[in-house]
Amino acid sequence: MNQEDNTGGGGIFGLFKWTKDALFGTDISPSMKYKDQEERRDRSRYAQDDTNFSMKFGNDSNRRSTNLSRSNSWSGLDSTLHRKYELLPEYNENGFNSIVNGDHHSKERIRSLRSPAPIVPREPLRNEPTDTFGHRLHTKRRTINELSNSQIPFIPPQEDDPLLSKLFNKDGVNEVRRSPYKLSVKDIPGKFPSPLTKRDEIDNYYVRDEDACHKNREYKKAYFDLFAQMDLNSRDLEDLCEDVREQREQFHRNEQTYKQAYEEMRAELVNELKKSKTLFENYYSLGQKYKSLKKVLDQTISHEAELATSRERLYQEVDLKNFEIQTLKQRLSDLELKYTNLQIEKDMQRDNYESEIHDLLLQLSLRNNERKDTSAGSNIFSTGQYDRTPFHNGNDSYDSNSHSWDTDYLKNIDGFIER
């Protein structure tokens, strides 16, 4: 018993002590505790184990028994015990494990999953008797109303709990009920909350018949088998926790690997996005340049078409002008030829006219000379001078000042020449 108290509530001894206290240390038997308690608020009136010692009661809250402050395996219970020793990890609103997100409380809770339950008494530990059941014989019985103010609300077990299913097997209970004699709670070792109004019933405990003792031995054997199974379950649970821890470490390693790969992929994606952005900007700039060049090319093609049209029109005008020039040249050539012919003809006519005039003048001069000769017939030889015609004055050129001529006759001659 001392060895169990010194374990601090951990290991198989703490588990055994917890089970023993849960079975034999309550004011109400386990079968009566859950009987006819369908609602949760009714079940919460009863607390497990001897944690009722530290509950506060109404007006008698200052009244304490000197034998009620002993520490036990469940004296350290508070509202966070189930959260602390919960095997499954909690998840936040995003669905991720809170340990991964850096929850310090969850890390501490997971780290202490396999640690023994601490013994934290609600009052300072005193050097008092460690008898769990004997001190209750002389204490005042507490009522249900006093138990309703418990600081630790009762949490009913699950219906599929294998431990409770084996402890409270309905077949075994029905078998006991069908037996020819009814077993009293006093036939089972330990103290139960049944009212002990008569002391002689306790004194007559050792004189029950042998069948009841045999039943008690069978119950004890079942309890020890159950404890052995619980020991195996504890070992399996430790192995399972070790596997969970290893898997969690492997999960963290994989997560770190994935996170590093994600960071690398993200950095590479950012670089690719930057390159894509630069490429897109260059492509957009090139597209704008292409559009401007295409516009200039279209304008150039339009100008070239207009230039070709203008060139064609100019060529046509040049051809037309060349034709006109050729025509004018031909006409000019014809006119020059005609002018030349006319000039030649005019020169020839002038020469003819001059020749005729010369002949006429010569004839006229001869006639005048003959007339003069006729009028001065007798004295021709007496004059010593021979009158020559205007055309015979030394250089055979006509001298208009040497002799006077008939102007009317000459006018007629000039008019003939002009014609």
Curated annotation (Swiss-Prot):
> What does the subunit comment say?
Homodimer. Interacts with KAR1, MPS2 and SPC29.
Q: What is this protein called?
A: Spindle pole component BBP1
Q: Where found?
A: Cytoplasm, Cytoskeleton, Microtubule organizing center, Spindle pole body
| Compositionally biased intervals (Low complexity) | 64-75
What domain of life? Eukaryota
What the record says about family reads: Belongs to the BBP1 family.
* Gene coding for it: BBP1
Instruction: List residues modified as Phosphoserine.
Output: 29, 73, 115
Tell me the segments the record calls region Disordered. Answer: 34-76
Cellular component, GO annotation: cytoplasm; spindle pole body
> Coiled coil located at which positions?
229-355
The keyword Thylakoid is assigned to this record: no
- Pfam families, per the entry: BBP1_C (PF15272), BBP1_N (PF15271)
Asked whether the keyword Transmembrane helix is assigned, the reply is no
Q: What does the function comment of this entry state?
A: Component of the spindle pole body (SPB) required for insertion of the nascent SPB into the nuclear envelope and for the proper execution of spindle pole body (SPB) duplication. Connects the central plaque of the SPB with the half-bridge. Required for proper localization of CDC5 at the SPB and for proper M-phase progression.
Q: Where is the composition biased (Basic and acidic residues)?
A: 34-48
UniProtKB keywords? Coiled coil, Cytoplasm, Cytoskeleton, Phosphoprotein
